[in-house]
Amino acid sequence: MAHRLLRDAQADGWERSDFPIICESCLGDNPYVRMLRAEYDKECKICARPFTVFRWRPGRDARYKKTEICQTCCKLKNVCQVCLLDLEYGLPVQVRDTALSTNSNDAIPRSDVNREYFAEEHDRRARAGIDYDSSNGKARANDTILKLQRTAPYYKRNRAHVCSFYVRGECTRGAECPYRHEMPETGELSQQNIKDRYYGVNDPVALKLLSKAGEMPSLTPPDDESIRTLYIGGLDSRVTEQDLRDQFYAHGEIETIRMVLQRACAFVTYTTREGAEKAAEELANKLVIKGVRLKLMWGKPQAPKPEEDEAGRQGHVAHGGMLPRAVISQQQSGDQPQPPGMEGQQQPASASYYFNIPAPPAAERTLYPSMDPQRMGALVESQEGDGKPGPQQAGQGQASSSSGQSYPEPPPPYYHGGQYPPYYPPYGGYMPPPRMPYQQPPQYPAYQPMLAPPAQSQASSLQQPAPATQQLGQGPQQQTTQNGMT
């Protein structure tokens, strides 16, 4: 290889690429993927030549994935560089070759020298624009491939591996462990080899798929010869009525196509029974339209309705089961007018009350003292505007006062500034507890101010004795007069 390096630096046989060749399942559902590119990091597991390795994480809960084979070996088999499944159908190489009756292993040598020469020759033809193998990716899919092909990505394949410490019961990471805490699957599928998958020899996954294809049942025509309708399930918004007509018209003349988008299904009715049988035989288990796999079955006739319920439902079909209360009252009273020709005949009694079921009895409502309008002083003024209660309210007030104890109206609350505070609805549906009934304050005797005594006549004042202060002031004077006289 040294002499080739001297002539051409690009002729060393090592792969140089800017992007991998992978399937949609391995790429992941995240549209923003960060890839690590390492030139000549690993050797191909098929041809053992160094190649550019790409490493990325398909999703949040997925493990890191990397390319396993070089692009030269990938193009020879038209497979993914990671999972080694067919890029077009998503099937193993053994299933694809068996279904298409081809053997792609004859053209690929097994020895090291011949394999290297074959890979270099293929690269030279690819750079020159020569298609080395025109069958890969261009063969028409047959019945087996249509039955087994995967029409949607399978992202479950990107899950993390099983934790080996958890299997032994020694994992101490718990929820922080990046691996799955599950028991590994045992059986034939647990023993897989990458070379057997690439060459299509002794692949356990391929053998399981081939056995599944042989066990798929076919559609058996029903015994009723009048059934000419086929049921198509699993419809998508991408499939239109014209697509169904183009797919089914090749097997016979179509009478009607009815699509039920709410149930994601459709019904195709043929004019003849032979056309329906031919379409069911040729499209069973392999109906794919615009990349959407559809389910095909024979239609079933609708179950006949009971005769006794037919008369009861006629009155509710016209009104949707919801009758006006006036009509209900007429039906209950028996005054509903009868149609002409039905006079004197008894009408069925089962058609009156279908949706008009009486309401259940209301639960007992808790009554609080604050809910009594008479106790809270809720009086309505009369229309005369004289500030007196109306006749009804007055009568009720008299009745309440005569029957029991009455309470005066409480004074209005006082707010600072003369404005009432704004009302805010309760937050979060919380309702405040009911207000306690108004309690009248204790009654005290009215306060009477002290008043001066009334004025008296002059004669009466002379007869009355002088106050104590005057007597005390006049005492010494009288005493001196007496002493002087003596």
Curated annotation (Swiss-Prot):
Protein name: Zinc finger CCCH domain-containing protein 49
Comp. bias intervals (Pro residues): 431-444
Zinc-finger as UniProt keyword: yes
Keyword Ligase among UniProt keywords: no
A molecular function (GO) term: DNA binding
Stretch list, region Disordered: 329-348, 379-486
CC annotations in GO: Prp19 complex; U2-type catalytic step 1 spliceosome; U2-type catalytic step 2 spliceosome
Keywords: DNA-binding, Metal-binding, RNA-binding, Zinc, Zinc-finger
Positions of the RRM domain: 228-301
Record InterPro entries: Cwc2/Slt11 (IPR039171), Nucleotide-bd_a/b_plait_sf (IPR012677), RBD_domain_sf (IPR035979), RRM_dom (IPR000504), STL11/RBM22-like_N (IPR048995), Torus (IPR032297), Znf_CCCH (IPR000571), Znf_CCCH_sf (IPR036855)
Zinc fingers typed C3H1-type, residue spans: 157-184
Start-end of Low complexity biased regions: 389-407, 415-430, 445-486
